[in-house]
């Protein structure tokens, strides 16, 4: 049973909530620095801002303008949206509209869901944000629902059921509105669920289509699951895609196959660990590219897909770029899926290289052993990946991607076959992720994580700045020559985009696992990010640097101190 609370501010100085966010507004989002209308700050997900008021020379004067309590002790991974003087922010249990200049709450809509929902959430109770379109704010709800709210009042317009926790599903990602369709994905590969992407009518909430990411017998791709197509699982779609409105193509990443053990699912296991190009009106898959066929390592390929125009091979291309969890950075022609570049950007021993003629990885000898389920191996990157869901940014001025990357390996040990036979791999069962024993390998004395400035066509880092713990936050790059990101020890930092030098830092009192954004209001540039992390006992044992970081969610907004 859901409950809705509307809290109205009593001041007469609140901004007027405009009825905007047309398809044209969303298409032009990258060119409207006074707004943040989409996840990724534009359809391209470059997370680049043309604003320069906050720059290398002025950032030392950056101070908090206000902070808003999210009244939550879970992970605050949400990205704020900003329109006409209002910030819209989500947590797992609420959506709020806030005055950008004062931090005062305009309205708040609460959400409730059954306690058992947490049983099918793999890696934390969180929400990553929403979408704006035609006077509505769209979001997903953890227990498998999609919701539309009135942006003026916070009142619910529609609320529809997509999936159930009994089937092993959860929903944590921000929706994408493309060509008038609200598009969402699901989590659940660790619970043997079958991934899908869905499109909804923005006005009514009626489901328009569903595209499954793993086939059933007789469907295209079923031949890549020999003897297993009837039970194929995985391919979760738990982050948010990008959109090229000129090509009318949505690009969405898919997760790992289930179970982790690859012995009984020989074959490529399409369309897991892939990038899919989809028509938003119909859900038709136009092309796909798979990064990790027959994946035994949990290398979810759901990382942000960045759209840009770059020179590759002496020619200008409309490309998509992805720093993947498996340690390779892929550049594809987004018109047809042709692979243009694939290079390691982090330590990756599971594959020697990517064969550019076939587009397939050349497996290492160690990977072949684990695929045959015969003996333990050491492998890089670890199960969390060279990066994870937290989005990178790209500057068209420097031509570099700014990526938070982990520097951790893993020892894999296959479970005995007799134990595998006892596992229940039915949808909704946790065993989907428990068929291989893992032990992390930490570098000593090297940093466990880096912020890297990477040439996307070569994978080479112009610079890298080390951190004791891997950062779990998104990055933001600006024309002011700065990269903003957060640390798990609670600092928001500003880094020189050309050198990697940390120029400014601020302690927010809880770990930052959110996504910084910037915009301007009445001639003043602001930076906003969520703060709030929750670490389980295992995480605290493995990383003493985050063992004592407090919990507690907040939304922080900064501006320059007047001279």
Predicted segments with their positions:
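Aromatic (tryptophan-biased) beta-strands that constitute blades/sheets of beta-rich domains
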Residues: 21-70, 104-119, 155-164, 206-214, ...
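Sec/Tat signal peptide C-region and signal peptidase I cleavage site
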Residues: 16-20
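Blade-level signature of beta-propeller repeat domains, shared across WD40, Kelch, NHL, RCC1
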Residues: 516-563
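Loop/turn-rich, solvent-exposed surfaces of beta-rich toroidal or solenoidal domains
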Residues: 309, 407, 437-501
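Beta-propeller blade signature
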Residues: 149, 195-207, 268-284, 329-337, ...
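Blade-loop segments of beta-propeller domains
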Residues: 68-82, 92-134, 164, 287, ...
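Repeat-blade elements of multi-bladed beta-propeller folds
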Residues: 36-40, 73-92, 119-145, 170-194, ...
